[in-house]
Swiss-Prot record:
One Pfam family here: GCS2
GO MF: ATP binding; glutamate-cysteine ligase activity
UniProt record similarity statement: Belongs to the glutamate--cysteine ligase type 2 family. YbdK subfamily.
Xref: NCBIfam families: gshA_cyan_rel, PRK13516.1
InterPro entries associated with the record: GCL_type2/YbdK_subfam, GCS2, Gln_synth/guanido_kin_cat_dom, YbdK
Nuclease found in the keyword field: no
Protein name: Putative glutamate--cysteine ligase 2
Top EC class of this enzyme: ligase
Source species of the chain: Burkholderia cenocepacia (strain HI2424)
GO biological process: modified amino acid biosynthetic process
Length: 371
Protein backbone atom coordinates (compact mmCIF):
# COMPACT_ATOMS: atom_id res chain seq x y z
CA UNK A 1 0.00 0.00 0.00
CA UNK A 2 1.35 3.44 -0.94
CA UNK A 3 1.82 6.12 1.66
CA UNK A 4 -0.93 8.74 1.65
CA UNK A 5 -0.12 12.09 0.09
CA UNK A 6 0.71 14.66 2.75
CA UNK A 7 -2.12 17.20 2.74
CA UNK A 8 -0.65 20.56 3.69
CA UNK A 9 -2.63 22.12 6.54
CA UNK A 10 -2.78 25.46 8.32
CA UNK A 11 0.29 25.65 10.57
CA UNK A 12 -0.26 25.41 14.32
CA UNK A 13 -3.93 24.53 14.15
CA UNK A 14 -4.57 21.55 16.40
CA UNK A 15 -6.99 18.81 17.32
CA UNK A 16 -7.45 16.87 20.54
CA UNK A 17 -8.43 13.21 20.96
CA UNK A 18 -9.28 11.72 24.36
CA UNK A 19 -9.90 8.05 25.17
CA UNK A 20 -12.37 7.80 28.05
CA UNK A 21 -13.14 5.12 30.64
CA UNK A 22 -16.70 3.76 30.79
CA UNK A 23 -17.53 2.40 34.27
CA UNK A 24 -20.55 1.05 36.11
CA UNK A 25 -22.00 3.01 39.03
CA UNK A 26 -22.12 0.04 41.40
CA UNK A 27 -18.45 -0.59 42.15
CA UNK A 28 -16.95 1.65 39.41
CA UNK A 29 -15.27 -1.17 37.51
CA UNK A 30 -15.11 -0.88 33.73
CA UNK A 31 -18.31 -1.92 31.99
CA UNK A 32 -19.41 -2.85 28.46
CA UNK A 33 -21.39 0.15 27.28
CA UNK A 34 -19.62 1.75 24.31
CA UNK A 35 -22.12 0.37 21.78
CA UNK A 36 -25.05 1.68 23.81
CA UNK A 37 -23.40 5.09 24.17
CA UNK A 38 -22.85 5.26 20.41
CA UNK A 39 -26.53 4.44 19.85
CA UNK A 40 -27.73 7.14 22.25
CA UNK A 41 -25.66 9.97 20.77
CA UNK A 42 -27.00 9.43 17.26
CA UNK A 43 -28.83 12.57 16.22
CA UNK A 44 -27.10 14.75 18.81
CA UNK A 45 -25.37 17.88 17.56
CA UNK A 46 -21.86 18.61 18.79
CA UNK A 47 -18.51 19.75 17.41
CA UNK A 48 -15.89 17.16 16.55
CA UNK A 49 -16.61 13.45 16.79
CA UNK A 50 -17.29 10.55 19.15
CA UNK A 51 -16.13 7.07 18.13
CA UNK A 52 -15.73 3.60 19.70
CA UNK A 53 -12.33 2.28 20.69
CA UNK A 54 -10.78 -1.18 20.83
CA UNK A 55 -12.86 -2.52 23.75
CA UNK A 56 -16.46 -1.98 24.83
CA UNK A 57 -15.22 -0.17 27.96
CA UNK A 58 -13.70 2.75 26.05
CA UNK A 59 -14.99 5.65 24.01
CA UNK A 60 -13.06 8.36 22.17
CA UNK A 61 -13.98 11.99 21.73
CA UNK A 62 -12.20 14.35 19.37
CA UNK A 63 -12.44 18.05 18.62
CA UNK A 64 -12.55 19.61 15.21
CA UNK A 65 -9.70 21.75 13.92
CA UNK A 66 -8.92 24.28 16.66
CA UNK A 67 -7.09 27.59 16.41
CA UNK A 68 -7.06 28.67 20.05
CA UNK A 69 -7.19 27.56 23.66
CA UNK A 70 -10.64 29.12 24.01
CA UNK A 71 -11.99 27.12 21.06
CA UNK A 72 -10.51 23.85 22.34
CA UNK A 73 -12.04 24.35 25.80
CA UNK A 74 -15.43 25.16 24.28
CA UNK A 75 -15.45 22.13 21.98
CA UNK A 76 -14.21 19.71 24.63
CA UNK A 77 -16.87 20.88 27.08
CA UNK A 78 -19.61 20.53 24.47
CA UNK A 79 -18.59 17.00 23.45
CA UNK A 80 -18.08 15.98 27.07
CA UNK A 81 -21.56 17.20 27.99
CA UNK A 82 -23.19 15.13 25.21
CA UNK A 83 -21.38 12.03 26.42
CA UNK A 84 -22.23 12.67 30.08
CA UNK A 85 -25.92 13.07 29.19
CA UNK A 86 -25.90 9.73 27.36
CA UNK A 87 -24.00 8.05 30.19
CA UNK A 88 -26.55 9.29 32.72
CA UNK A 89 -29.35 7.73 30.66
CA UNK A 90 -27.51 4.40 30.83
CA UNK A 91 -26.57 4.84 34.51
CA UNK A 92 -22.88 4.47 33.72
CA UNK A 93 -19.98 6.73 34.62
CA UNK A 94 -17.24 8.33 32.53
CA UNK A 95 -13.75 9.08 33.76
CA UNK A 96 -10.38 10.31 32.61
CA UNK A 97 -7.16 8.66 33.70
CA UNK A 98 -4.58 6.67 31.76
CA UNK A 99 -5.44 3.32 33.34
CA UNK A 100 -8.40 1.98 35.26
CA UNK A 101 -7.26 1.38 38.82
CA UNK A 102 -8.47 -2.18 39.35
CA UNK A 103 -10.01 -3.65 36.17
CA UNK A 104 -8.91 -7.13 35.07
CA UNK A 105 -7.82 -7.09 31.43
CA UNK A 106 -9.17 -10.60 30.78
CA UNK A 107 -12.73 -9.32 31.34
CA UNK A 108 -12.57 -6.93 28.41
CA UNK A 109 -14.62 -7.44 25.23
CA UNK A 110 -13.22 -6.33 21.87
CA UNK A 111 -15.48 -3.83 20.08
CA UNK A 112 -17.13 -5.36 17.01
CA UNK A 113 -15.30 -3.54 14.21
CA UNK A 114 -13.04 -5.09 11.54
CA UNK A 115 -9.83 -3.26 12.51
CA UNK A 116 -10.26 -3.99 16.22
CA UNK A 117 -10.92 -7.67 15.49
CA UNK A 118 -7.80 -7.74 13.29
CA UNK A 119 -5.69 -6.21 16.09
CA UNK A 120 -7.09 -8.77 18.54
CA UNK A 121 -6.18 -11.66 16.22
CA UNK A 122 -2.71 -10.25 15.56
CA UNK A 123 -1.68 -9.28 19.08
CA UNK A 124 -3.66 -11.74 21.19
CA UNK A 125 -4.02 -10.82 24.86
CA UNK A 126 -2.09 -7.57 24.31
CA UNK A 127 -5.18 -6.17 22.58
CA UNK A 128 -7.27 -6.55 25.74
CA UNK A 129 -4.41 -5.27 27.87
CA UNK A 130 -4.49 -2.23 25.60
CA UNK A 131 -7.54 -1.01 27.51
CA UNK A 132 -5.58 2.07 28.47
CA UNK A 133 -6.58 5.64 27.86
CA UNK A 134 -4.53 8.33 26.14
CA UNK A 135 -4.67 11.87 24.87
CA UNK A 136 -3.46 12.50 21.33
CA UNK A 137 -2.79 15.97 19.92
CA UNK A 138 -2.53 16.75 16.20
CA UNK A 139 -0.56 19.80 15.07
CA UNK A 140 -1.06 21.26 11.59
CA UNK A 141 2.06 21.49 9.39
CA UNK A 142 2.57 23.56 6.22
CA UNK A 143 4.41 20.81 4.31
CA UNK A 144 5.75 17.27 4.88
CA UNK A 145 9.40 18.23 5.45
CA UNK A 146 8.32 20.72 8.10
CA UNK A 147 6.26 17.95 9.70
CA UNK A 148 9.32 15.72 10.03
CA UNK A 149 11.43 18.61 11.35
CA UNK A 150 8.75 19.33 13.95
CA UNK A 151 8.39 15.66 14.86
CA UNK A 152 12.07 15.27 15.70
CA UNK A 153 12.31 18.69 17.38
CA UNK A 154 9.28 17.85 19.52
CA UNK A 155 10.81 14.52 20.58
CA UNK A 156 13.11 16.32 23.03
CA UNK A 157 10.01 17.47 24.93
CA UNK A 158 8.32 14.08 25.23
CA UNK A 159 9.17 13.90 28.99
CA UNK A 160 7.26 17.16 29.52
CA UNK A 161 4.09 15.80 27.94
CA UNK A 162 4.27 12.51 29.84
CA UNK A 163 4.89 14.12 33.24
CA UNK A 164 2.24 16.82 32.86
CA UNK A 165 -0.51 14.41 31.78
CA UNK A 166 0.45 11.41 33.94
CA UNK A 167 -2.67 9.90 35.49
CA UNK A 168 -2.07 6.15 35.67
CA UNK A 169 -0.40 5.19 38.96
CA UNK A 170 -2.66 2.18 39.62
CA UNK A 171 -2.92 -1.07 37.64
CA UNK A 172 -4.99 -4.09 38.74
CA UNK A 173 -5.32 -2.95 42.38
CA UNK A 174 -1.63 -2.10 42.73
CA UNK A 175 0.18 1.22 43.07
CA UNK A 176 2.84 0.65 40.43
CA UNK A 177 5.17 3.37 41.69
CA UNK A 178 4.89 4.98 38.24
CA UNK A 179 3.18 8.25 37.46
CA UNK A 180 2.31 6.91 33.99
CA UNK A 181 2.06 3.12 33.96
CA UNK A 182 -0.06 3.29 30.78
CA UNK A 183 2.97 3.67 28.53
CA UNK A 184 4.37 0.34 29.73
CA UNK A 185 1.42 -1.30 27.94
CA UNK A 186 2.12 0.64 24.75
CA UNK A 187 5.80 -0.32 24.77
CA UNK A 188 4.83 -4.00 24.49
CA UNK A 189 3.85 -3.47 20.85
CA UNK A 190 6.66 -4.15 18.35
CA UNK A 191 6.16 -0.94 16.33
CA UNK A 192 6.11 1.44 19.29
CA UNK A 193 8.81 3.86 20.46
CA UNK A 194 10.24 6.60 18.28
CA UNK A 195 10.02 7.31 14.57
CA UNK A 196 13.12 6.75 12.39
CA UNK A 197 15.44 9.73 12.08
CA UNK A 198 14.69 10.95 8.58
CA UNK A 199 14.20 14.63 7.76
CA UNK A 200 12.78 14.63 4.22
CA UNK A 201 9.47 13.23 3.05
CA UNK A 202 11.17 11.45 0.14
CA UNK A 203 13.33 9.54 2.63
CA UNK A 204 10.30 8.80 4.79
CA UNK A 205 8.42 7.42 1.78
CA UNK A 206 11.38 5.15 1.05
CA UNK A 207 11.34 3.90 4.65
CA UNK A 208 7.59 3.30 4.54
CA UNK A 209 7.83 1.39 1.25
CA UNK A 210 10.54 -0.86 2.69
CA UNK A 211 8.38 -1.59 5.74
CA UNK A 212 5.36 -2.40 3.58
CA UNK A 213 7.50 -4.71 1.43
CA UNK A 214 8.48 -6.68 4.53
CA UNK A 215 4.80 -7.39 5.14
CA UNK A 216 5.04 -5.94 8.64
CA UNK A 217 2.84 -2.89 8.04
CA UNK A 218 -0.04 -1.93 5.78
CA UNK A 219 -0.61 1.69 6.78
CA UNK A 220 0.56 4.42 9.14
CA UNK A 221 -1.95 3.12 11.71
CA UNK A 222 0.33 0.13 12.26
CA UNK A 223 3.01 2.36 13.79
CA UNK A 224 2.50 3.05 17.51
CA UNK A 225 5.23 5.68 17.67
CA UNK A 226 5.27 8.34 20.37
CA UNK A 227 4.94 10.95 17.62
CA UNK A 228 3.94 10.02 14.10
CA UNK A 229 3.07 11.93 10.93
CA UNK A 230 -0.55 11.81 9.82
CA UNK A 231 -0.32 12.64 6.11
CA UNK A 232 -4.06 12.49 5.46
CA UNK A 233 -4.59 15.27 8.01
CA UNK A 234 -1.41 17.20 7.27
CA UNK A 235 -0.34 16.89 10.91
CA UNK A 236 2.01 15.28 13.34
CA UNK A 237 0.28 13.37 16.14
CA UNK A 238 1.73 13.45 19.67
CA UNK A 239 0.60 10.23 21.37
CA UNK A 240 2.39 9.88 24.72
CA UNK A 241 -0.07 11.58 27.06
CA UNK A 242 -2.37 9.87 29.53
CA UNK A 243 -5.94 11.12 29.34
CA UNK A 244 -6.16 13.84 32.01
CA UNK A 245 -8.90 13.79 34.63
CA UNK A 246 -10.57 16.91 33.19
CA UNK A 247 -11.08 18.38 29.74
CA UNK A 248 -9.64 21.70 30.93
CA UNK A 249 -6.31 20.02 31.73
CA UNK A 250 -6.39 18.29 28.34
CA UNK A 251 -6.90 21.65 26.61
CA UNK A 252 -4.03 23.25 28.52
CA UNK A 253 -1.62 20.45 27.58
CA UNK A 254 -2.74 20.63 23.94
CA UNK A 255 -2.05 24.37 23.85
CA UNK A 256 1.37 23.87 25.43
CA UNK A 257 2.15 21.54 22.52
CA UNK A 258 0.69 24.03 20.02
CA UNK A 259 2.80 26.89 21.41
CA UNK A 260 5.92 24.76 21.51
CA UNK A 261 5.31 23.78 17.87
CA UNK A 262 5.14 27.43 16.82
CA UNK A 263 8.40 28.13 18.63
CA UNK A 264 10.18 25.11 17.14
CA UNK A 265 9.07 25.70 13.55
CA UNK A 266 9.29 29.49 13.53
CA UNK A 267 12.53 30.06 15.47
CA UNK A 268 14.15 26.70 14.60
CA UNK A 269 16.30 26.80 17.75
CA UNK A 270 17.46 23.17 17.54
CA UNK A 271 20.06 21.58 15.30
CA UNK A 272 18.69 18.08 14.83
CA UNK A 273 20.87 14.99 15.09
CA UNK A 274 20.49 11.25 15.52
CA UNK A 275 22.37 11.78 18.79
CA UNK A 276 19.28 13.55 20.15
CA UNK A 277 17.93 10.05 20.76
CA UNK A 278 20.86 8.83 22.89
CA UNK A 279 18.96 9.66 26.08
CA UNK A 280 15.44 9.45 24.65
CA UNK A 281 14.45 6.19 26.36
CA UNK A 282 16.07 7.24 29.65
CA UNK A 283 14.23 10.58 29.71
CA UNK A 284 10.99 8.86 28.76
CA UNK A 285 11.37 6.36 31.61
CA UNK A 286 12.14 9.11 34.13
CA UNK A 287 8.94 10.93 33.18
CA UNK A 288 6.84 7.77 33.42
CA UNK A 289 8.35 6.67 36.73
CA UNK A 290 8.83 9.94 38.61
CA UNK A 291 6.62 12.47 36.84
CA UNK A 292 7.66 16.10 37.20
CA UNK A 293 10.36 15.11 39.70
CA UNK A 294 12.05 12.94 37.07
CA UNK A 295 15.44 13.75 35.59
CA UNK A 296 15.78 15.14 32.08
CA UNK A 297 19.18 14.92 30.35
CA UNK A 298 20.04 17.29 27.50
CA UNK A 299 21.41 15.05 24.72
CA UNK A 300 23.77 17.74 23.41
CA UNK A 301 25.23 19.18 26.63
CA UNK A 302 24.70 16.36 29.12
CA UNK A 303 23.08 18.85 31.52
CA UNK A 304 20.74 17.21 34.04
CA UNK A 305 17.75 18.93 35.60
CA UNK A 306 14.30 17.96 36.79
CA UNK A 307 11.54 17.79 34.21
CA UNK A 308 9.69 20.49 36.15
CA UNK A 309 12.69 22.82 35.86
CA UNK A 310 12.99 22.11 32.15
CA UNK A 311 9.30 22.91 31.64
CA UNK A 312 9.62 26.24 33.47
CA UNK A 313 12.65 27.18 31.37
CA UNK A 314 10.78 26.22 28.20
CA UNK A 315 7.77 28.33 29.20
CA UNK A 316 10.02 31.38 29.43
CA UNK A 317 11.42 30.73 25.96
CA UNK A 318 8.06 30.23 24.27
CA UNK A 319 6.23 33.10 26.02
CA UNK A 320 6.17 35.36 22.91
CA UNK A 321 4.52 32.57 20.94
CA UNK A 322 1.95 32.05 23.71
CA UNK A 323 1.05 35.72 23.42
CA UNK A 324 0.67 35.44 19.64
CA UNK A 325 -1.59 32.38 19.93
CA UNK A 326 -3.65 33.62 22.88
CA UNK A 327 -2.59 30.67 25.01
CA UNK A 328 -1.20 32.49 28.05
CA UNK A 329 -3.94 31.15 30.36
CA UNK A 330 -3.18 27.58 29.28
CA UNK A 331 0.53 28.03 29.84
CA UNK A 332 -0.08 29.64 33.23
CA UNK A 333 -1.81 26.38 34.23
CA UNK A 334 1.16 24.36 32.94
CA UNK A 335 3.54 26.59 34.89
CA UNK A 336 1.54 26.16 38.09
CA UNK A 337 1.73 22.36 37.76
CA UNK A 338 5.48 22.49 37.16
CA UNK A 339 6.09 24.81 40.13
CA UNK A 340 4.01 22.64 42.46
CA UNK A 341 5.39 19.44 40.88
CA UNK A 342 1.97 17.83 40.93
CA UNK A 343 -0.10 16.09 38.27
CA UNK A 344 -3.22 13.93 38.12
CA UNK A 345 -1.27 10.91 39.36
CA UNK A 346 -0.50 12.91 42.51
CA UNK A 347 -4.20 13.70 42.93
CA UNK A 348 -5.21 10.05 42.51
CA UNK A 349 -2.70 8.91 45.11
CA UNK A 350 -3.92 11.58 47.53
CA UNK A 351 -7.54 10.49 47.12
CA UNK A 352 -6.64 6.83 47.64
CA UNK A 353 -4.60 7.68 50.74
CA UNK A 354 -7.60 9.50 52.19
CA UNK A 355 -10.32 7.04 51.16
CA UNK A 356 -8.44 3.70 51.36
CA UNK A 357 -10.60 2.52 48.45
CA UNK A 358 -9.85 2.36 44.74
CA UNK A 359 -13.59 2.08 44.06
CA UNK A 360 -14.10 5.45 45.75
CA UNK A 361 -11.09 6.84 43.93
CA UNK A 362 -12.65 5.98 40.56
CA UNK A 363 -15.98 7.44 41.70
CA UNK A 364 -14.22 10.73 42.40
CA UNK A 365 -12.51 10.50 39.00
CA UNK A 366 -16.00 10.46 37.47
CA UNK A 367 -16.86 13.64 39.37
CA UNK A 368 -13.66 15.32 38.15
CA UNK A 369 -14.62 14.49 34.56
CA UNK A 370 -17.82 16.55 34.93
CA UNK A 371 -16.04 19.69 36.19
Amino acid sequence: MALETFVNSEPFTFGVELEIQVVNTHNYDLTKAASDLMRLIQGETFPGNITPEITESMIELSTGICHSHEQAVSELHAIRDVLVKAADQLNVGLAGGGTHAFQQWSDRQIYDAPRFQYISELYGYLAKQFTVFGQHVHIGCPDPDSALFLLHSMSRFIPHFIALSASSPFVQNVDTGFHSARLNSVFAFPLSGRAPFVLTWDSFEEYFTKMVNTGVVNSMKDFYWDIRPKPGYGTIEVRVMDTPLSVDRAAAIACYIQTLARYLLTDRPLKLSEDDYLVYTFNRFEACRFGLEGTCVNPQTGERRTIAEDILDTLDRIAPHAAALGSRAALDEIGALAKARVNDASWLRTVFKQEKSLNETVRQQCLRWRE
